[in-house]
């Protein structure tokens, strides 16, 4: 219940500033905050992609070793290891 009252008060406060001619300043500040958040998220995604590129050789090697222990051939695609039997015997 307290959250609803807080958000109602926040809406009233924002609308009061908007009516007072400060609408563009508030909107600019909100846009800047969302822009910074977007940049941080995109940087995090880029870091995650870089880590996955570094991790692929380790996962490929693990997959090959895992399948070799089963006397199969290992193939790793998109972090999914699949063991394939060669030869039909």
UniProtKB/Swiss-Prot annotation:
Residues 1-20 form the signal peptide. Residues 53-89 form the BetaSPN-type CS-alpha/beta domain. Keywords: Disulfide bond, Ion channel impairing toxin, Neurotoxin, Potassium channel impairing toxin, Secreted, Signal, Toxin. It is found in: Secreted. Expressed by the venom gland. Inhibits voltage-gated potassium channel. The keyword Disulfide bond applies. GO terms for molecular function: potassium channel regulator activity; toxin activity. Disulfide bonds join 56-76, 63-81, 67-83. One of its GO terms (cellular component) is extracellular region. It holds the Pfam family Scorpion_toxin_alpha-beta. This is Neurotoxin beta-KTx 12. PROSITE patterns: BSPN_CSAB. Residues 21-39 form a propeptide.
